[in-house]
Design a protein with these regions (language model features):
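A structural signal for short secondary-structure junctions
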Residues: 102, 162-164, 326, 388-391, ...
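Catalytic alpha/beta core domains of metabolic enzymes, predominantly
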Residues: 4-159, 242-244, 249-391, 395-398
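Active-site loops and adjacent core secondary-structure elements that bind or stabilize anionic groups
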Residues: 126-238, 242-249, 262
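Radical SAM enzyme core and accessory elements
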Residues: 179-184, 415, 422, 426, ...
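Beta-strand/loop-dominated core regions that host nucleotide or nucleotide-derived cofactor-binding catalytic loops
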Residues: 421-424, 431-455
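Nucleotide-binding motor/catalytic cores of P-loop/tubulin-like NTPases across gene-expression machines
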Residues: 402-408, 412-432
Length: 460
């Protein structure tokens, strides 16, 4: 039994809207019939191209089934995830968030690539989550005000541009020379340079330095100190409007909570070396919420990988639930291996966009293609991508056919959908605005549609 976010009936939409509640009720109507007739050979597939809707819908379905004593297996997937790193990151955010909580029996990673490219991605994702099984118990409590089914962003008091109503920040690690050389290209909010000051401080850049260096620096402009937990007693001795403090679950709560309450200028850098880092990092933030502490939290994740795809999958899977739970005020990805800093930074921004927390580029929703696709899907995606890549904030659907395309790209602002041999239809939202136009003209007419409708974006 499958339910897609973009294909709900008018009856369901009129009552629930395009919401997780509507998706779940649409599924439960059929499951109740199956249960009534004692039919158990059922697998459920709940999908959306929106990772937040997908995860919340599956969580709500599991809760609803439990209440009605149903225990059908679940198939997981982020529909029409796209291609390349974006498709992998989006899939890992959604699927990983559920697998990490023990939800899911089969998965599919839906990529606009050759079908055989999907299997290694899916296998690595499952294998990575499986490594966390059998871990030592994390003796944590859940904050009673936290709603796992309908989570809202954790309330924090902003420190400069971190927390509060700000979008989550991106932190990166660079040595001093790299920071001086690459920072013009970097879009990161904070650059950690450790114990070495950059040779030249670029205007608008923010540098995180070890607290000892901060104390010694004559010119502290654009510098922000970071303290390991062992240096917590020195926090009060250092004057700065923003301080970072590295913490992990298991630090004596009475010590670090008192420090955070006394110093609202602290941003917590939450780390973990636990086998189940998600559980450990969740535990620290819930401990803070129980104590009423509202300091922002940046999640720092450390890897030792040489393969960029593995890095993207693992980092996205680790961050998925933390973002969807509303706990994330920033991400800091680090890697001890042969992966370029630009790839690490790009992955961080990609994860935030996949989690619907921060938009940094155009988003593409595209199907894998099938026998009904009557045009060169991958070549068309490349041409549309090249022409629209700078249209930050737009979601563009590129679908092979009209059978599932309009429904499965329901979250897109604009759509390019195969309508027959040599014919394309263009969509604005869910409305078809140009029917059966020649394929050779379709990309240009899509651009014209965007530029006419969104001149502030389309004419960049």
């Amino acid at each position: 039994i499958g339910v897609n976010h973009g294909s709900l009936s008018d009856r369901i939409r009129n009552r629930y809207g395009d919401t997780p509640e509507g998706i779940v009720e649409s599924c439960m109507e059929f499951l109740r019939i199956c249960k009534k007739h004692d039919f158990g050979d059922v697998v459920i597939s709940i999908k959306s191209s929106n990772t937040v809707v997908m995860v919340r819908s599956v969580r709500l379905l599991v809760d609803t089934m439990d209440k009605e004593d149903m225990h059908y297996p679940l198939h997981l997937g982020v529909t029409e995830a796209g291609e390349g790193e974006d498709g992998r990151i989006k899939s890992a955010v959604g699927i990983g968030a559920l697998l990490a909580d023990g939800i899911g029996d089969t998965i599919r990673v839906s990529l606009t690539e050759e079908p055989e490219a999907e299997i290694p991605v899916a296998r690595h994702l499952v294998d990575y989550i499986d490594r966390k099984a059998g871990h030592q118990l994390i003796p944590a409590e859940t904050y009673e005000g936290f709603d796992w089914l309908r989570p809202e962003r954790r309330t924090t008091k902003p420190v400069d541009n971190i927390g509060g109503g700000n979008v989550p920040v991106v932190m990166v690690s660079e040595n001093a020379d790299n920071a001086a050389r690459d920072e013009d290209a970097s879009k990161a909010d904070y650059i950690y340079v450790g114990s070495n000051l950059p040779k030249e401080r670029k205007e608008g850049k923010r540098y995180v330095v070890d607290y000892q260096l901060y104390v010694q620096a004559d010119d502290k402009s654009q510098l922000y100190p970071i303290f390991p937990v062992t240096a917590m007693p020195f926090v009060s001795m250092v004057q700065a409007k923003l301080k970072f403090l590295v913490l992990q679950f298991g630090t004596p709560a009475d010590e670090y909570l008192a420090c955070l309450k006394t110093h609202p200028e602290i941003v917590v850098v939450c780390v973990s070396n636990h086998q189940n880092r998600l559980g450990s990092q969740r535990a620290l933030v819930h401990e803070m919420m129980i104590a009423g502490v509202e300091n922002p939290v940046v999640f720092a994740q450390m890897y030792r990988l040489n393969d960029a795809e593995e890095f993207q999958l693992e980092a996205a899977a680790d961050m998925g639930a933390l973002m969807i739970d509303g706990l994330c005020d920033g991400i800091w990805l680090m890697n001890d291996g042969d992966i370029a800093p630009s790839t690490i930074e790009g992955t961080t921004f990609g994860i935030l966009q996949a989690g619907r927390l921060r938009t940094s580029k155009t988003e593409y929703i595209s199907c894998p293609g099938c026998g009904r696709t009557l045009y060169d899907l991958r070549d068309t995606i490349k041409r549309i991508h090249e022409a629209t890549k700078d249209m930050k904030g737009l979601k563009i659907g590129i679908m092979g056919c009209i059978v599932n395309g309009p429904g499965e790209m329901a979250d897109a602002d604009y759509g390019y959908v195969g309508a027959g041999p040599g014919k394309i239809s263009l969509y604005k939202g869910k409305e078809c605005v140009e029917h059966n136009i020649p394929e050779g003209e379709a990309v240009e007419r899509l651009l014209r549609l965007i530029k006419t409708d969104r001149p502030e974006i389309g004419n960049k």
